[in-house]
Regions:
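An N-terminal hydrophobic leader/cap segment in hydrolases
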Residues: 1-44
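Short coil/turn segments at beta-strand junctions that form active-site/ligand-binding loops
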Residues: 64, 135-137
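Short, hydrophobic alpha-helix immediately C-terminal to the catalytic nucleophile
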Residues: 82, 122, 151-155
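Alpha/beta-hydrolase active-site loop
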Residues: 112-132
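Primarily recognizes the serine-hydrolase "nucleophile elbow" in alpha/beta-hydrolase
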Residues: 137-181
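A catalytic-pocket lid/entrance helix-loop region that shapes and gates access to the active site
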Residues: 179-194
Length: 202
């Protein structure tokens, strides 16, 4: 859901005492702020199921390729891609940074761990082709749940100019990720969670 469980929210307040972790967090935060101030255009499309999707369009001069960047679960476009944004720009990449459904400024109250997000990814590739005239290659890139979203999008009928996918830290299955979330974030045994879910369906 859009609203995080209370335990998950409190967990964000806990940081390790590692100086390296604190330093890394500050570097990521600074890069995110720089990307947010880089002058990207805020754009909006309507998903296949009618919800509003927000993106940040960052065209470059003389682009050689376009990237659709999908961020992860309970994250943001600037947080997940702030550190790589300059690299992409310096290598002639225009980028569409998507805000995933059910998060931040996009519509919807739920995330589907890639099941619906794959269609959103397709919608963004179509938007780019309408914007640019299908003139240059498109690459799909994602982190965490965003990585799973772009991988699942590969089974759809993507435009011919989608040339590749970069998936960073995708999860292997819905069961695997729910086991991790239930045990690490919700502190509920996975078997108990499955039993509760089955009981609710009866």
């Amino acid at each position: 859901d859009r609203v995080a469980p209370q335990d998950r929210s409190n967990g964000k307040m806990r940081v390790s005492g590692s100086p390296e972790m604190i330093e890394t967090t500050e570097i990521v935060k600074k890069a995110a702020g720089q990307l947010e101030k880089s002058g990207c255009d805020v754009v909006e499309i309507t998903a296949h199921d009618g919800i509003s999707l927000i993106g940040h369009w960052c065209p470059c001069e003389e682009p050689k390729r376009t990237i659709v960047a999908m961020h992860g679960w309970r994250s943001s476009w600037s947080h997940d891609f702030g550190l790589i944004a300059d690299f992409w720009r310096n290598n002639h990449c225009s980028v569409l940074y998507a805000e995933q459904r059910g998060q931040n400024n996009s519509g919807g109250n739920h995330m589907s761990l890639g099941l619906l997000e794959r269609y959103d990814c397709l919608a963004w590739t179509n938007w780019i082709n309408e914007k640019t005239g299908k003139s240059i290659p498109i690459y799909l890139a994602g982190v965490s749940m965003g990585a799973t979203s772009v991988l699942m999008a590969s089974e759809l009928e993507l435009p011919d100019n989608v040339f590749g996918i970069a998936a960073d830290s995708a999860f292997t299955s819905l069961h695997a990720i729910w086991k991790h979330v239930s045990e690490s974030n919700l502190h509920i045994p996975y078997a108990c969670l499955l039993y509760t879910s089955d009981a609710a369906d009866d």
